[in-house]
UniProtKB/Swiss-Prot annotation:
This is Bifunctional NAD(P)H-hydrate repair enzyme Nnr. It comes from Mycobacterium tuberculosis (strain CDC 1551 / Oshkosh). The keyword Lyase applies. Residues 1-211 are annotated as: NAD(P)H-hydrate epimerase. Residues 210-473 form the YjeF C-terminal domain. Its cofactor is K(+). Residues 348-354 are annotated as: NADPHX 2. (6S)-NADPHX 1 binds at D152. ADP binds at residues 382-386, 402-411. Residues 10-205 form the YjeF N-terminal domain.
Length: 473
């Protein structure tokens, strides 16, 4: 499990170490880890460290000190080291002295011969975009295609929200210390490496699943299981206008677990043509017993669609609401707020704005939490980084790592997957987070098939790669 910590939590954990260690020892410990990772990056890119050139772009304060100490350690390993001081009067004095003593050079700009740039401009206590001088330096670095290693966070990106409101550093690698911060999931930080500096960190409720976490939770049939005990998923989706939504949603539910899927709606003929294992009926009342309902994809907002939504929410079963269901729900939020059974809402940004009365804005975690608490429902906010908030509970962050899932019908596939996990008995937040993780893996696999490179994919192909993504966990 990945844990993401606030700046205040990190600072509180650093305090006892700073009080007990000799002055500067914690900075040098962090910088040594940073230099080690930079050395690995240099070796991977250029074949070694000796004779290579690094340049630290140094701001005021400890972040710049980390960068200077790392450059000093690399200098001792045989690299040439330069430093651009953005604020010479406020540069970390001890780190600067060590850097110059090691033979490091102070320069006005980054040389075109530089193999790697160290971003030591702004640390986790900073905020806002790059100031003009730093922005100019990194614009030149980007134009020259020199890779950047960021110290703790890429400068110019908000540490708590991942928001970028102006010029910011584009990092190939970010090396962070002690614990991950939300920005490492919410923004593009390149590859992220965590260096252990000995912090004793308190509890965090901002989490991220890893493959082992998903594998441990995904239902696997046991020797006493049958199609009913594994969970029966009910799907209320599709219409004469959008029958494909029903096909995609039910197909994903079929692929996600080994139980049973029941479908009710006007697209039952199309569903059976694609998935003969589905039990299909024309109305929800005729569907039979299920353990969870998925309602909304392609459903329409007419009287029949409203009746299906009301039917599902009136049960004491877990319910996932998506797409047209969310559009109708925006006018009747009390239908969810009054439920005792688990409810999962899966809006994109536009649907979120209708539900919450305002778009999520830069603070997607805070906005998702607020809506989940207000409605008493698990909220999954779609995006390249999926944010899942449990009411009064944890938030799960799932960075997809690519954008191949941004295709029509992809959300219908995700809804079917989550519904199947709800039917299996998984708690709503974990079901949403696990499904989002596998959905992202399936999207990447679909884009990579048949290879050798990635290519545009579709929701049907994403659904077709769910099983492969599960098998690879």
């Amino acid at each position: 499990m990945r844990h993401y910590y606030s700046v205040d939590t990190i600072r509180a954990a650093e305090a006892p170490l700073l009080a007990s260690l000799p002055d500067g020892a914690l900075m040098r410990r962090a910088a040594f880890g940073l230099a080690t990772e930079i050395g690995r990056e240099l070796t991977a890119r250029t074949g070694g460290v000796v004779g290579r050139r690094v340049c630290a772009v140094v701001g005021s304060g400890d972040n710049g000190g980390d960068a200077l100490w790392a450059a000093t350690f690399l200098r001792r390993r045989g690299a040439a080291a330069d430093a651009v001081l953005l604020n010479p009067d406020r540069t970390h004095r001890k780190a600067l002295a060590a850097f110059t003593k090691s033979g490091g050079r102070l320069v006005e700009s980054v040389s075109a011969a530089t193999d790697l740039v160290i971003d030591g401009v702004v640390g986790i206590s900073g905020s806002g975009p790059l100031r003009p001088a730093a922005a100019q330096v990194f614009a030149a670095v980007q134009a020259a295609a020199i890779p950047v290693v960021a110290v703790d966070i890429p400068s110019g990106i908000d540490v708590a929200t991942g928001a970028i409101t102006g010029p910011a550093v584009h990092a190939a690698l970010t090396v962070t210390f002690g614990g991950l911060k939300p920005v490492h999931a919410l923004a593009d930080c390149g590859r992220v490496v965590l260096v252990d500096i000995g912090l004793d960190l308190a509890h965090t409720d901002v989490l991220g699943f890893e493959a082992t976490d998903v594998a441990a939770r995904w239902p696997v049939p046991g020797p006493r299981d049958d199609k009913y005990t594994q969970g029966v998923t009910g799907v209320l989706a599709g219409s004469s206008t959008y029958p494909g939504a029903a096909v995609l949603c039910t197909g994903a539910a079929v692929a996600a677990t080994s139980g049973m899927v029941r479908y009710a709606g006007t697209a039952h003929a199309e569903v059976l043509a694609h998935w003969p294992e589905v039990i299909a009926s024309p109305t929800p009342a005729a569907a039979g017993r299920v353990q969870a309902w998925v309602v909304g994809p392609g459903l329409g907002t007419d009287e029949a669609g409203a009746a299906a939504l009301w039917f599902a929410l009136d049960t004491d079963l877990p319910v996932l609401v998506d797409a047209d269901g969310l559009t109708m729900l925006a006018d009747h939020p009390d239908l969810v707020a009054g439920r005792n059974a688990p409810t999962v809402l899966t809006p994109h940004a536009g649907e979120f704005a209708r539900l919450a009365g305002a778009p999520p804005g830069d603070d997607r975690v805070g906005a998702c939490r607020q809506l989940a608490d207000a409605l008493g429902a698990t909220v999954l906010l779609k995006g390249n980084v999926t944010v899942i908030a449990d009411p009064g509970g944890p938030v799960y962050l799932n960075p997809a790592g690519q954008s191949w899932a941004a295709t029509a019908g992809s959300g219908d596939v995700l809804s079917g997957m989550i519904g199947a996990l709800l039917a299996s008995g998984l708690p709503s937040g974990e079901a949403a987070a696990a499904a989002a993780f596998v959905h992202a893996r399936a999207s990447a696999a679909a884009a990579a098939d048949p290879g050798p490179g990635d290519a545009p994919t579709s929701a049907s192909r994403i659904s077709g790669h769910i099983r492969a993504a599960l098998a690879a966990l």
